[in-house]
Amino acid sequence: MPVFDYEDIQLVPNKCIVKSRSEVNTKVKFGPMTFKIPVVPANMQTIIDENLAVWLAKNGYFYIMHRFYENERVDFVKNMHDKGLFASISVGVKPAEYDLIDELSQKNLVPEYITIDIAHGHSDTVINMIKHIKHKLPGVFVIAGNVGTPEAVRELENAGADATKVGIGPGKACITKLKTGFGTGGWQLAAIRACAKAASKPIVADGGIRNNGDIAKSIRFGASMCMIGSLFAGHDETPGDIIEKDGKKFKTYFGSASQYQKGEYKNVEGKKLLLPYKGKIADTLREMQEDLQSAISYAGGKELLALRKVDYVIVKNSIYNGDML
C-alpha cells in the first residue's frame, strides 16, 4: 500500500461555493452526540482534568477523561451527570477495571462514552473488555484502541466496539517507534486510510497531528474524530504549573507510557517535554474551527464530509513527523 504521513500530503482544492468561511459547518455526530469540531484533547494526565472536562462538555466539545485517577471515575461520572453533562471516561484491562464496570452498572451510573485505552489494542484482553462493557452497560458508546491495522479494526468492531482509535506511537511524547521498532510513526495517515477502508464504524485518528491542517487531512482519509495531545498542551486550563525558563513560559507535557506517568523506569515508551505556554484553550479551539472552515471551503463544500471527496498529492516522506528528536 502507499505509505505517507501528514507532512507528505497536500490536498488539492476544488471550486469554492461559499461567500464566507463562516457559512461552513464543522459539526460532527459522534456516537449519541454532536460536537462543534471533530477534535478531542488526548486523554492524558497533562492534557485533561475534571475542570477542563466540564468546560469542554458545557461548550459543545468532545472530551475523554484519562484513567490515571482510578478510584475517582465513579464519582466523576456522577458529578458530570449531576451537572447535566455527558460523561466520558477511560478504562484499562486489568481485573480492577472489570470491578469498575460492575460498580457503574450496579449504581446505574452509565457514562455516554467509555474508551478502552491500551497501547496495543489488538489483543484478547481488549476484546474481552469490550464484551464485558457491552454486557454490563449496553447503552455505552465504546471506543477501543489503540490499533494500527485493518485486521485489528475488524476484530474490535466484531467484538462490539462502536469506534476504534488508530495510532501506535506517532505522538510527540511517544517513543514507541524508537524503543520497539513497531508503530505507525511516519505512516500514521496511511494507517488511518487503510483502517478506515476496513471499518464499518467511526475511526479516531490518534497521534501525529502537528498542525491544524492535519485535522482536515485526517478527515479526508477516513477519520471521524481526531485525538490531539501536543497542540492542546501548555494552556491555562491544562493540568500542571507554568514554568519560567530564560524569560519564557512553558508547561510540562509527558506521554502516558513515560516514567513520569508510571512513577518508575519500566517498559518506558514515552518522554517528557517542555512546551511553550499558549494561553486560553478557547482561543486554540476557535482557531482550529476557523482553519477547518477554511479547509472545507477549499474542498468546495459547506460541511465536513466535503473533505472526503478531494484529490491529494504525495510530496515526500519522513519517519519523524517533523519532530526534532
UniProtKB/Swiss-Prot annotation:
Enzyme class, broadest EC rank: oxidoreductase
InterPro entries: Aldolase_TIM, GMP_reductase, GuaC_type_2, IMP_DH/GMP_Rdtase_CS, IMP_DH_GMPRt
Binding locations of NADP(+): 203-226
GO molecular function annotations of the record: GMP reductase activity
Annotated keywords: NADP, Oxidoreductase
EC number(s) reported in the record: 1.7.1.7
Any Pfam family: IMPDH
Reaction(s) catalysed by this chain's protein: IMP + NH4(+) + NADP(+) = GMP + NADPH + 2 H(+)
Transmembrane segment boundaries: none
A GO CC term assigned to this protein in UniProt: GMP reductase complex
Family to which the UniProt record says this protein belongs: Belongs to the IMPDH/GMPR family. GuaC type 2 subfamily.
PANTHER family according to UniProt: GMP REDUCTASE (PTHR43170:SF5)
Protein purpose: Catalyzes the irreversible NADPH-dependent deamination of GMP to IMP. It functions in the conversion of nucleobase, nucleoside and nucleotide derivatives of G to A nucleotides, and in maintaining the intracellular balance of A and G nucleotides.
Name listed for the protein in its UniProt record: GMP reductase
Gene name tied to this protein: guaC
